[in-house]
């Protein structure tokens, strides 16, 4: 316990002083090792070896943490020095230092393996509020100065990589904890957090019902679901893939919330609401899920902003002293959902018809061998990206905001 408190104090003092432990420098020289869904399944198979998994994670997790810590350090000083970002940085340093301690302990000792699981649980819990805390840091930074286009571009680049890094480390920790922890809390049909036979329609239905419950509570009404399945590989059979149901649920829940809100608000004077239509198609390479609504759509000029961390129409949430800030209000739903899709080489796109509705499409890999982690690595290319400037546009482009015609002078 004393050692843990010492590590925590050391991490915070190093972070606040702008210093980087030599362990961060050491592990940042290595590139992360992406795993495929198939490899993750093999790690958790019936013949799974806890020692092998532990040996991999005690090396891989510090590498992933160190790589993203190096990127935090090249962000604007005013952002890095905010209390929120300093707190996140101290969490990452503390977690890295705790994991590195296991390099000095025997991997053949069962007590060490048990302690490693406990440490992973501690790290996972410590990082629980990383997303809202970093988001609060961005808000503090935006409130303190004007964010120029170059910085805005760099922050979008960084946050995509930072949150993808978090998704990946959380995935690895959850797999090991669920498979090797003494407390069996996972689904018995799953391997860790992965369902080898994920029923896509069932996840769609569950995410829809969760969203519908919120919609009913807020609007006292909600649209129905119209679900269509097309199995191009095995016609007529239900669609199953190897995937992480919680990741898919996260994406669908966010998209359904948006679709329902738009539908109810756009059709508030209609006698009935048009259903949200979902089409699930399994092809040879991809699983595609299309969510279509008749919620009026959004203008083209706004579509790109929907995936921006720096743009949100929601009121800014207030964090309490315990740092327990809600995600709602940060406007991170869509960009984080797209990262979940991209994590295993998929994607998420929005196609909107202003005045009619929106199609949201999730693309996932159909084969587990092709579902490979998409991981950020801190190298010369990444460093150069933060040094790039935006060249002057060589096209004459009008303002992206619509003109207020009431203020325009009428030409005589």
UniProtKB/Swiss-Prot annotation:
Q: In which tissues is it expressed?
A: Detected in heart, white adipose tissue and muscle.
Can you say where in the cell this protein is located? Mitochondrion matrix
InterPro entries according to UniProt? AK/P_DHK_N_sf, BCDHK/PDK_N, BCKD/PDK, HATPase_C_sf, His_kinase_dom
Q: Name one Pfam family in it.
A: BCDHK_Adom3
Q: Name one GO cellular component term.
A: mitochondrial matrix
Q: Where does ATP bind?
A: 254-261, 293, 312-313, 329-334
Outline the extent of the Histidine kinase domain: 138-368
- Give the enzyme's EC designation: 2.7.11.2
Sorted alphabetically, which keywords does the UniProt record give?
ATP-binding, Hibernation, Kinase, Mitochondrion, Nucleotide-binding, Transferase, Transit peptide
Q: Write down the chemical reaction(s) this protein catalyses.
A: L-seryl-[pyruvate dehydrogenase E1 alpha subunit] + ATP = O-phospho-L-seryl-[pyruvate dehydrogenase E1 alpha subunit] + ADP + H(+)
Molecular function GO labels: ATP binding; pyruvate dehydrogenase (acetyl-transferring) kinase activity
Main location (coarse class): mitochondrion
Q: Is Magnesium included in the keywords of this UniProt record? A: no
* Reported function: Kinase that plays a key role in regulation of glucose and fatty acid metabolism and homeostasis via phosphorylation of the pyruvate dehydrogenase subunits PDHA1 and PDHA2. This inhibits pyruvate dehydrogenase activity, and thereby regulates metabolite flux through the tricarboxylic acid cycle, down-regulates aerobic respiration and inhibits the formation of acetyl-coenzyme A from pyruvate. Inhibition of pyruvate dehydrogenase decreases glucose utilization and increases fat metabolism in response to prolonged fasting and starvation.
What interactions and quaternary structure are annotated?
Homodimer. Interacts with the pyruvate dehydrogenase complex subunit DLAT, and is part of the multimeric pyruvate dehydrogenase complex that contains multiple copies of pyruvate dehydrogenase (E1), dihydrolipoamide acetyltransferase (DLAT, E2) and lipoamide dehydrogenase (DLD, E3).
Record-given protein name:
[Pyruvate dehydrogenase (acetyl-transferring)] kinase isozyme 4, mitochondrial
